[in-house]
């Protein structure tokens, strides 16, 4: 719907109509299949008949849930903010606990807690076009407390019974976007070592969170053991949800939401990863999920069978998406072929969770793309430096430049192209100081206590070993007699440069002082940061000469 209003912006009513029907309209585009979602669920066998029973929560748990809420002054439909709830927490904590326990016991989510206040935010472009607005949904503040109680017990039940797929990295404890990217990278790199060509499908789902079909979701959780009162509560939570739009000091009428998960909710992301949970079990490929971001990878030693396998995987995935009423955008779904052989002429790149991989894993595209973004930030620092202090410019640097610079560094930092990022960082530091472009940078890194990109890389790699140290063997395990390097971890052998980079972390760990190796990861990181702030390094070789 375009240009709904001749005035500057659409009305609250027009925006509400658009937001409330977008999930339905996308859902209706998906044609029915002869399959049932339950057929796909059969690939996840249930080894026991355990059911989820919500236990009553304690006053202390309610207090913890209130403390966990983000401190915000934003008011919900009832003009209640989380700041207000935190202010009066001790006065309401006992009755709130009773209310939550009543909901858990009866299996009914109150209708008053299912009304969302939606505030539209203009994303870009023409302000008269409703497509250019992003809905920001504000749920009743008290509903967050109930949701935390439900989510905690539901997650515990699923994890205890080992129902959640290892392929899902989104909205799960101790898992991150980098873990997801690393899973894909390792699969491709391991294939390189064994002379495999890898085909990766980057699937694009249209409005996935808005399209989740409630009845299909409820069948899925029932399969996992959410039955009886617990099942009724989840059904009650999703049904009869409503929203109204607040825009330009006007409030729209209230409309019903029949599809999708509530934006801004605690339970919504958890519900969605449960919805996607049986996809990997139905595909014979390496699957990496981060919520709705889906990559499917297959590999073979020759191109002809790889193409056949790729077509089969795409077809099977498309059937799963269609049967589960999710809209696969085939125009935006991308295929990229990875190969280490120079005889292959594959090219191109694709971005997954903010990290760009090229067909040979050289990381050139990632570094060049990042360099371009960082140059724009340096320009902004230069402009503001004329009117603010170096301390203020330093805050801008950390907020915009440094955070982008170190994202995914442990993956792409070992490439030769990382020097381009170091050059950009030097330019940024000179801009903070307001110095001449040709001035020496090491004193500036020390003065402002900024870690170089190579220092950040050394810290990430060396401390990263601590998480999986038990997986590596020591040299003393293989050599029976006493040697000086007996406490060093054994390096693995690799055929290619791209896979040999995995040894970088072990090499850096082996250079750490012996007395550090039994310390915690946190303490070692602190020691390295304290050392490398005073001794800026421009290469990993410098770190190996003087690690601490």
Language-model segments: which ranges?
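Extended, well-ordered alpha-helical segments in internal regulatory regions
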Residues: 400-415, 456-469
